[in-house]
Amino acid sequence: MNIQSILSNKIKQAMRQAGADEQCDALVKPSGKPQFGDYQANGIMATAKKLGLNPRDFAQKVLDLIDLKNIAEKMEIAGPGFINIFLDKNWLAENIQVTLQDKKLGVTVEEIQTIVVDYSSPNVAKEMHVGHLRSTIIGDAVVRTLEFLGHNVIRANHVGDWGTQFGMLIAYLEKMENEHASAMELADLEAFYRAAKEHYDNDETFAEKARNYVVKLQNGDAYCRTMWKKLVDITMQQNQRNYDRLNVTLTQNDVMGESLYNPMLPEIVADLKAQGLAVEDEGAQVVYLEEFKNKDGDPMGVIVQKKDGGFLYTTTDIAAAKYRYHTLKADRALVFSDTRQSQHMQQAWLITRKAGYVPDSFQLEHKNFGMMLGKDGKPFKTRSGGTVKLTDLLDEAIERADKLISEKSTALSSKEKAAVIEAVGIGSVKYADLSKNRTTDYVFDWDIMLSFEGNTAPYMQYAYTRIRSIFNKTDISEEQLHPAKIQLTDEKERLLAIKLLQFEETVQIVGKEGTPHILCAYLYELAGLFSSFYEHCPILNNDNENVKLSRLKLALLTEKTLKQGLDLLGIKTVEKM
């Protein structure tokens, strides 16, 4: 259920009855402070201004027309025209009962869409590094959320599997195979790439062969395609190990690399020329966009085909948008990539729309993110200033979690301890990123992310196990709890109930905006409210059996919500810590 949506619809209906037009917005939001109610309608003043009415008079008119019987305990006008809404505790209790019985915790979807999510996108013949972390884990959290909401999600791992470098890589792979070098030498992809480049720079015979292989590959030569496919497969097998460690849902079946769109590129450039969108400029094919200006204030030129006939990333991204609409039949396409790619994506999509390749109804959304910084505020690097390999980062996360858990948890079996170390280590790296607004840069700090205090993975995982421990101390089963009635007699119970019922509106925001930090903030607030409830409202040692069972049900729904929420983020929970 979505309280915000229920209240918005009811208040908008009253606003229209009071004289507002169809486009009016109630702007209902959860209140920041208890004295302002549980929810507040903030759209009255703007609508009153449009109608030329006194905001408080209009608010009173709306208040008289709102039908919130059995939903709101009371409503009041505050300040210049806000409407404060205090929810009825019996209505809350009834909805907690319903939510607890629903496998999806009351979450529904109004309109199922087919949504393509383009994320991760590493390069072939190179190892994944920390620069791939944000796209991979933010994209995957949004994918999980959209699927939970009932949408048909198509994962698109837009890997860099094409380009002139493949001539040199194929030539070097051939050299290794001719020398009977073990495929194990490809375990270090960075070393393989460096060695290929060194041969290319220093051996003219090798370089000539590499250049020939580029042409052959682009012309579809069977041998070159086979060698190219080997490089792609070896790379993606190694990347899969990172995905599995990160508890990310990508598989090799989700690879939709740049090469997929190659057959479309000549046709797209020819069509752009035919439409008069692309013009020749110094041998290249260029689209000039009035919407973007260069430093001289003239329309910016976007190259779609180079003088030598080669295509660019822009051309590929135009083809990808067209393919996702026409072939994949998507309603919406999200691309998770660095903020520095924002202008590039906007230009590619503007050309796509100008050419009529997709309708206005097709949503193309760049979900950009900032950089991961070191404590010095500079891009995160190794001590020697090199790029941090993703596998090295995850190894260090496990080592640090091992030290942390070994100090704190002495009662765990070796199997339990290993599960906790993995959940905390990997979870800490992911949660530290996911809990930050993706559009901003963030500082990577081991001490903060592995802390059991604050908005961190260890704190959230411990909050979950703490509730599990309550149920481990009682022989009352979930089935036995089922007939018990929810009672919200204490204010802390009521506040916890409201937060539990806000799960859907939170998840809907994540699905719409692609912002997992909203879910992290919600789960952190939920854990805090449960902690306050647990301290002030006795559960197992309560003399009143009805109150005890009611509070156990609140605890059970909190446990389920924390587990489901963390799972949407791709973060594992453990039964004991």
Curated annotation (Swiss-Prot):
Keywords for this protein: Aminoacyl-tRNA synthetase, ATP-binding, Cytoplasm, Ligase, Nucleotide-binding, Protein biosynthesis
What SUPFAM superfamilies would the database entry show? Anticodon-binding domain of a subclass of class I aminoacyl-tRNA synthetases, Arginyl-tRNA synthetase (ArgRS), N-terminal 'additional' domain, Nucleotidylyl transferase
Q: Which reaction does it catalyse?
A: tRNA(Arg) + L-arginine + ATP = L-arginyl-tRNA(Arg) + AMP + diphosphate
Enumerate the GO terms in the molecular function aspect. arginine-tRNA ligase activity; ATP binding
A GO biological process of this protein is: arginyl-tRNA aminoacylation
Q: Where is this motif: 'HIGH' region?
A: 122-132
Record-linked CDD domains: Anticodon_Ia_Arg (cd07956), ArgRS_core (cd00671)
This protein's source sits in the domain of life called Bacteria
For this UniProt entry, what's an example GO CC term?
cytoplasm
Q: What is its EC number?
A: 6.1.1.19
User: According to its UniProt record, where is this protein located?
Assistant: Cytoplasm
Tell me the protein family, please: Belongs to the class-I aminoacyl-tRNA synthetase family.
Task: Spell out the subunit comment.
Answer: Monomer.
Q: What is this protein called?
A: Arginine--tRNA ligase
Species name: Histophilus somni (strain 129Pt) (Haemophilus somnus)
